[in-house]
């Protein structure tokens, strides 16, 4: 679906890969996008001025600048991403007086930030309450947002995988020896990556598995130091690469593995399912909307033995679970193709504009 002339003002972190993908696809489908950001990312954007020493004040003090931009560019839609940050900023700027506001939830803005303090909770709630529509990638996430504030309307739209990358889906489901496991989550406390190494170190040291992690994350140095001491060269680290190259790289693995302590519906897991990997993840609510023990493996958070037993089963039984993997890919094709997900977003934008005009 194309939307010629639809003018969208996106407020988001310009450093984020999710922002890059989102803005690029809106433009590909015919939207004119004006991206404003407090961060200084590589993509083309308008840089909002950061004022004050405290990051939380940056949003407050940028409100006047955003008001000026709204009057100048006259967008059809204002689309903040991350309710507790840019959603709050859009609310302070009175964006709703200029155009309908669609706020995209990113997960931690709802599941983590509000618990930091009363201030964080209230600013998140304010951002939500001043939105015409709130969009999240799981029912769990949207419900959590509704528990924080009265929301005018909401939708669930996943972050899917691009159509072209579905062609990288594995043709051969045979499990490799050693079993190749990829953990494509950055090294942050919430992703609990070192737990995975501790749990699976005996299997790695016996040469039964190979574990691959990204280079990215603020705890990367700490992770490497401790992980190397446990499994040596069975630990593989990959650097950031172009998306198409990474999709091909991920498709070469047998298993997708996550130990996230908090999450909505993980985009990386959906991508892995579309590519034909077997998913294994810690049993948390957002994950359950895509993963159960009928199409992959869930294990109790922090339970090393439970995770180790799942991986041992895969190695010993040598059961590639072909039916699961085909069914997972079909669901992704049906519900989580990125181009279709963005087309749905654009339709919602048109609906809001029409509703305001009527």
Report the location of each language-model feature.
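Donor nucleotide-sugar binding/catalytic pocket of nucleotide-sugar-dependent glycosyltransferases
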Residues: 103, 129-168, 176
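Conserved donor-binding/catalytic core segment of Leloir-type glycosyltransferases
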Residues: 172-202, 212
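Short hydrophobic beta-strand element within catalytic cores of glycosyltransferases
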Residues: 277-281
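A charged, aromatic-enriched C-terminal amphipathic alpha-helix characteristic of glycosyltransferases
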Residues: 319-353
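Conserved acidic donor-binding segment of nucleotide-sugar-dependent glycosyltransferases
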Residues: 293, 297-304, 313-319
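Nucleotide-activated donor-binding/catalytic signature segment of Leloir-type glycosyltransferases, i.e.
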Residues: 223-241
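Aromatic "clamp/platform" in nucleotide-sugar-dependent glycosyltransferases that forms part
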Residues: 261
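Glycosyltransferase donor-sugar binding loop
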Residues: 38-40, 184, 209-223
């Amino acid at each position: 679906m194309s939307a010629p002339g639809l003018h969208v003002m996106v407020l988001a972190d310009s450093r984020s890969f999710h922002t890059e993908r989102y803005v690029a696809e809106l433009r590909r489908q015919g939207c004119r996008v004006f991206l404003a950001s407090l961060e200084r990312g590589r993509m083309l954007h308008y840089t909002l001025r950061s004022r004050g020493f405290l990051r939380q004040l940056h949003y407050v003090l940028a409100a006047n600048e955003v008001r000026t931009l709204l009057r100048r560019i006259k967008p059809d839609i204002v689309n903040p991403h991350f309710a507790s940050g840019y959603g709050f900023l859009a609310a302070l700027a009175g964006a709703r007086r200029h155009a309908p506001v669609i706020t995209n939830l990113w997960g931690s803005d709802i599941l983590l930030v509000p618990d930091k303090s009363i201030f964080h909770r209230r600013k998140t709630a304010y951002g939500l309450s001043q939105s015409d529509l709130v969009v999240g990638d799981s029912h769990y996430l949207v419900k959590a947002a509704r528990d924080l504030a009265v929301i005018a309307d909401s939708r669930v739209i996943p972050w899917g995988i691009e159509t072209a990358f579905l062609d990288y889906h594995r043709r051969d489901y045979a499990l490799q020896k050693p079993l190749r496991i990829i953990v494509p989550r950055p090294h942050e406390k919430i992703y609990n990556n070192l737990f995975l190494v501790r749990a699976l170190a005996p299997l790695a040291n016996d040469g039964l598995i190979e574990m691959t992690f990204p280079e990215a994350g603020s705890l990367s140095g700490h992770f490497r130091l401790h992980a190397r001491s446990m499994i040596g060269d069975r630990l593989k680290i990959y650097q950031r690469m172009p998306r198409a190259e990474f999709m091909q790289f991920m498709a070469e693995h047998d298993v997708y593995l996550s130990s996230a302590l908090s999450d909505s519906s993980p985009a990386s897991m959906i991508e892995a399912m579309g590519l034909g990997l077997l998913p294994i993840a810690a049993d948390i609510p957002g994950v359950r909307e895509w993963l159960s023990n009928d199409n992959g493996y869930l294990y109790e958070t922090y339970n090393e033995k439970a995770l180790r037993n799942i991986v041992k089963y895969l190695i010993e039984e040598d059961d590639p679970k072909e039916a699961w993997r085909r069914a997972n890919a079909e669901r992704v094709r049906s519900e989580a193709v990125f181009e279709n997900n963005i087309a749905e977003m654009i339709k919602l934008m048109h609906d809001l504009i029409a509703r305001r005009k009527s």
